[in-house]
Amino acid sequence: MQKKRKMTLERRHNLTGWAFLSIGVILICWTSFYPMIQAFILSLKSGLGVNLKFNGFSNYARILKDPTFKGTLFNTFFYLIIQVPIMLTLALILASILNNKDLRFKGLWRTCIFLPCATSLVSYSMIFRSLFANDGFVNTVLRAVGATPIMWFSNAWTARTVIIIALIWRWTGYNMVFYLSGLQNIEYSVYEAARIDGATPRQILFKITIPLLKPTILLTTITSTNGTLQLFDESLNLTNGGPGKSTMTMSHYIYNTSFVQSPNFGYAAAMSIVILVMVAVLALIQMKVGDER
């Protein structure tokens, strides 16, 4: 009898737990998975505006032949390969400097470095457009030192460089906070013991700091990769995809396909699904590599 009562009590607790959990599961399914399913169904249709008809996987076949999509894919991965490693390396260096217990005004430096990511996307894009304008601050400095001014937004490579600089400026401080939090969880006695044993700063960095920060580095790598693959604001507000479409990202192209050109929601949805698959595959690869190391 007592056993039955105990089992009933446990079952009640389990049911209560599942009842609370089910609310969150339903909300996640409704706000995340249901829109994904609808987007996939939409990607199987074609037509302009709301006049859509089912056409199978023709939108996906079109993606393989679309030169504009290939160009935006190249641009997006160019930003990813160049910007993410530089940004995360700078974030780790800054976090290591700010973790020094002898450094004065730590709070001030942390705030100053973190502040860019709290800036409005539109306002910071306008600031960078002004800085790199033909008569902007950067060209003024170049003239002052006797160098030739650069028409930053008239050339594809220099325009891409401006976007990369802007991304690094904005997001380095954000990732630095993660690294700083991880460093502060490492006992200072570990570093002291390493120094007593004669370890050099390079050995401390590669043998102690980076291995102990591996979960944090993996997290920032995945989030930064996902964010860059979905990059939109800088492409739109800084260069508007120009010159031509040489700096346009995949998300910017999806936006133009949906709302700027003749609206083709089916094709835009197909490109969105492709980005989703890329994000998922890269995240799985990064997690697999992180686990092996």
Question: Predicted regions span which residues?
Answer:
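A structural signal for multi-pass alpha-helical bundles of membrane permease subunits
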Residues: 4, 9-293
